Regions:
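Catalytic-site neighborhood detector that most strongly recognizes the C-terminal catalytic loop/helix
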Residues: 92, 192-217
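Conserved tyrosine-mediated DNA breakage-rejoining catalytic core shared by Y-recombinases
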Residues: 73-107
Length: 224
């Protein structure tokens, strides 16, 4: 299922669609706040302006709710095409624990095509660096988290999405699971990889006004 309950369309575009002139770096509020959440419309708009590699990166970060390092260091062996399952190895996770996450069939198919077209081997990085200054073969070295962060900030800036970063995909997805889908914090932890509920709660964005209203409605039902 894509964003908004429908199909989230990935448009393969050219990197030249992004202006070549320098950008003002996008940042979190005062560099100490949380990355902005993305609406379904913003997600669609963002994906439609990305080259295939970065589009796949963005979709994987969203659907897996993974950290940027976890996704940039994925290898071909981490995608189970048959079972439509992603394995994030403990060597890449913040908690040093391996976890598995289901992926939507369409995204798995797109990843399979990407892997095949680039002739990647089992131990190759899916999102490899293609820098001409590095004497490495395709798939041998992963793209850096810094280059992904820089690219995405420029893309967000160009289309006018304020306060967003690579962290927005993870935070948006976890908030949707909790607020829109009604998942418990314990259930979300199986996807997010958080070790504690407290650390997970810091990621989630809830509507305090709506929370207060629900609590007042409880008073009425209890007749207190």
């Amino acid at each position: 299922m894509g964003v908004g309950g429908g199909e989230m369309t990935l448009h393969a575009s050219s990197a030249s669609q992004l202006p070549s002139n320098p950008y003002q770096s996008m940042c979190k509020t005062n560099r100490s706040g949380k990355a902005s959440l993305l609406s379904h419309q913003q997600m669609e708009q963002f994906l439609s302006n990305l080259p295939v590699k970065y589009g796949l990166l963005a979709e994987l970060m969203y659907f897996s709710a993974g950290r940027v390092k976890e996704i940039t260091t994925l290898k071909v062996r981490n995608i189970n095409i048959k079972d439509e399952l992603l394995t994030i190895e403990k060597s890449s996770t913040k908690t040093k624990e391996t976890r598995q996450i289901p992926l939507p069939p369409r995204l798995v198919k797109s990843l399979g095509i990407w892997i095949q077209e680039n002739q990647l081997e089992t131990d190759d990085f899916i999102f490899f660096t293609d820098s001409r200054n590095m004497n490495v073969r395709r798939g041998e070295k992963s793209i850096s988290t810094q280059s992904v962060d820089t690219f995405f900030r420029k893309a967000f800036d160009w289309i006018g999405i304020e306060g967003a970063s690579t962290h927005s995909f993870r935070r948006t997805r976890l908030t949707e699971l909790h607020v829109d889908e009604g998942w418990s914090l314990r259930e979300i932890m199986d996807i997010s990889g958080h070790k504690s509920i407290i650390s997970l709660q810091q990621y989630l964005d809830t509507d305090k006004k709506n929370t207060f209203e629900k609590y007042r409605n409880l008073f009425q039902r209890e007749e207190v």
